[in-house]
Amino acid sequence: MATKVSSITSLNSPHNGSPIADIVLGVVPSWLLPYVSATINGLVGIVWGGSQNNLNASLNSLTTTNAASFNSTTPNASGVKYFSYGSKVTLPDLIQHPLMGVLVPVTGIGGMAKGQGIENDGLVPLSSQKWGTYKGTPSYSFWVTGLDHLEVSNTLSLGEKWFDVRSFWLSMAQNAKSNQ
């Protein structure tokens, strides 16, 4: 693989799984999961376009157990440099984090139960976001209460109010270029 790929960069990826996936699959009854999945898949399709979403398959692959299984059978490729960036919410207020603010405490509790720690972005524990060389989190002003999963990726332009999205993404691109 190293002859074709020099580096891989990830942002807030659940490399060691997400306790939210464990919780949803553990709490939502199996008979209800197809309906919940269809509803969320429909919403995702409306917001981002496309209809090839499969929440149930995604949740299954993102459990802490299945992530551990994947990691044990899929080692890093030699000669490829791995970099990761992450973020966390420092205060789960519903003003800055209207969608993720409710999930931060749940993910924190699940992260503690799974040995992943309490710090998280609303969906992924900070410890699970780290892979290879961890490059850190974006810089933001003192009044910002951290960056959640949607903000750091600037989904629906949610990050632009809270940090310099373009500079952050440019720094990731510059790091990838300098590690070719």
Language model segments and positions:
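Helical cap/lid subdomain of alpha/beta-hydrolase-fold lipid enzymes
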Residues: 2-180
